[in-house]
Swiss-Prot record:
InterPro entries from the UniProt entry: ThiC/Bza_core_dom, ThiC/BzaA/B
GO cellular component term, pick one: cytosol
Swiss-Prot/TrEMBL cofactor(s): [4Fe-4S] cluster
Organism of this sequence: Geobacter metallireducens (strain ATCC 53774 / DSM 7210 / GS-15)
Record function comment: Catalyzes the conversion of aminoimidazole ribotide (AIR) to 5-hydroxybenzimidazole (5-HBI) in a radical S-adenosyl-L-methionine (SAM)-dependent reaction. Is thus involved in the anaerobic biosynthesis of the benzimidazole lower axial ligand of the cobamide produced by G.metallireducens.
Protein known as: 5-hydroxybenzimidazole synthase
EC number of this enzyme: 4.1.99.23
A GO biological process held by the record: cobalamin biosynthetic process
UniProt keyword terms in alphabetical order: 4Fe-4S, Cobalamin biosynthesis, Iron, Iron-sulfur, Lyase, Metal-binding, S-adenosyl-L-methionine, Zinc
Domain of life: Bacteria
Length: 435
């Protein structure tokens, strides 16, 4: 069976492209053309047809939610509930990143529970199984890794983060660079670096990239090029090791497209605001416009407990400058495994950030809703305000918890409501839509 990019290059508009066009209010041929050029991807799988979600140029910024067990907390039911919570809160995609317990079981239960495109990181299970089998993750046999990639694709993975961009030269550059404030923060990245150093061998995912691509192409699983050397501190942002890996990933993105595979490129997780635009411009230029998947990014390192906010600030900037998919960050980041409420708060913060970014990325089509909300507030039209709200149930709950004496107003101002006062003074003028 053919991949979406191969279908698009033949001039055919698939049912998935049609669905994306309808959802995004763009023409089907636009979607087809961008898919053909590798500037839009539609995560999916021949063995499982998830909801059609387009990621890339000219489309709204999408939000990914990541869940998964840890070695300390293994609760399969909780992960399914978190997956459902993410879907209900508005996540566009989901990543199942378990490293504890029966990894086949949790992956399959999560995939069965949601209709979102689900992705994962195959290195996690590979190193977990090597540790269980041999007592040492560095004894991982590359054949086991490729077998796992195939098995996970068979299970229905719609996209897969694969750490292909770490090679021996990248590690040498990291060593020459020396000190890093945040060290290495990618579980998959540090595990692969450790394996390469222990075995004095090249990264098999880089060395046999054509094999990786061949497996994912077989299932039309999107290949998301992971960033194992991403900065884990804003003072490490855009350092030589990170940029070296990005350069390799951008080269691999071009190669993967030539092989008929849909390609994503992953971006960093900690970026000061003044570096966001340049980082995205660099990726877009070097990758030929491949969709960019930013992890956050967190914009300051000193707000644990509130990193859903620090990441939302960075994500809004990223969306504004061209990021196509952003990974949510929860309040539990750097502190604990997220629970259901953390997942909800993370998704909502990221959705708001994506919306704000899109308002500025697409001003001609992104601000009408805000104008209508302003008019509804001016007119004290509460029904309309809730209809326009990104999260109406949250807004309704807050208002209901503090009921005003006059239902036309709220308890913030009560008798001193500015909107009501201005309406009485300038009723005709303030309600003229031309103002």
């Amino acid at each position: 069976m053919k991949t979406q990019i191969e279908i698009a290059r033949e001039g055919t508009i698939s049912s998935q492209m049609m669905a994306v066009a309808a959802e995004e209010h763009v023409s089907p041929d636009y979607v087809r053309q961008m898919v053909a050029e590798g500037k839009i991807v539609i995560p999916g799988n021949h063995s499982r047809k998830p909801r059609a979600v387009g990621i890339g140029k000219g489309l709204r910024t999408k939000v990914n939610a990541s869940i998964g067990t840890s070695s300390d907390i293994i609760d399969y039911g909780a992960e399914v509930r978190k997956a459902l919570a993410a879907q209900e809160a508005g996540a566009d995609t989901l990543m199942e990143l378990s490293v504890g317990g029966d990894l086949d079981r949790v992956r399959r239960e999560v995939i069965a529970a949601v209709d979102l495109p689900v992705g994962n990181v195959p290195l996690y299970q590979a190193f977990c199984e090597a540790a269980r089998k041999y007592g040492d993750p560095n004894k991982l046999d590359p054949e086991m890794l490729f077998d796992l990639i195939e098995k996970q694709c068979e299970d229905g993975m719609a996209f897969m983060a694969v750490h292909c961009g770490i090679n021996l030269y990248t590690i040498e550059r990291l060593k020459r660079q020396g000190y890093r404030y945040g060290g290495l923060v990618s579980k998959g990245g540090v595990s692969m670096v450790a394996w390469m150093m222990a075995n004095r061998r090249e990264n098999p995912l880089y060395e046999q990239f054509d094999r990786v691509t061949s497996i994912l192409r077989k299932y039309d699983t999107v290949l998301s090029l992971g960033n194992g050397l991403r900065a884990g501190a804003i003072h490490d942002s855009s350092d030589r090791a990170q940029i070296q890996e990005l350069l390799i990933n951008c080269e691999l993105a071009e190669l993967g497209r030539e092989m008929g595979c849909q390609m994503l490129v992953e971006g960093p997780g900690h970026v000061p605001l003044d570096e966001v635009e340049g980082n995205i411009q660099l990726q877009k230029r070097m990758s030929g416009g491949a969709p960019y998947y930013m992890l956050g990014p967190i914009s300051t390192d000193v707000a644990p407990g509130f990193d859903h906010i620090t990441a939302a600030i960075g994500a809004a900037q990223s969306s504004r400058y061209g990021a196509d998919l952003i990974c949510y960050i929860t309040p539990a980041e750097h502190l604990a495994l997220p629970n259901e409420e953390d997942v909800r708060q993370g998704v909502k913060a990221a959705k708001i950030a994506a919306y704000i970014g899109d308002m500025n990325k697409y001003p001609e089509r992104g601000r009408e809703r805000d104008k209508e909300m302003s008019k509804a507030r001016r007119d004290l039209d509460w029904k309309k305000q809730f209809e326009l709200a990104l999260f109406p149930e949250d807004a309704k709950a807050i208002r209901a918890s503090r009921t005003p004496e006059d239902e036309a107003t709220c308890t913030m101002c009560g008798d001193f409501c500015a909107s009501r006062g201005a309406g009485k003074l300038f009723a005709a003028d303030l309600r003229g839509d031309k103002i």
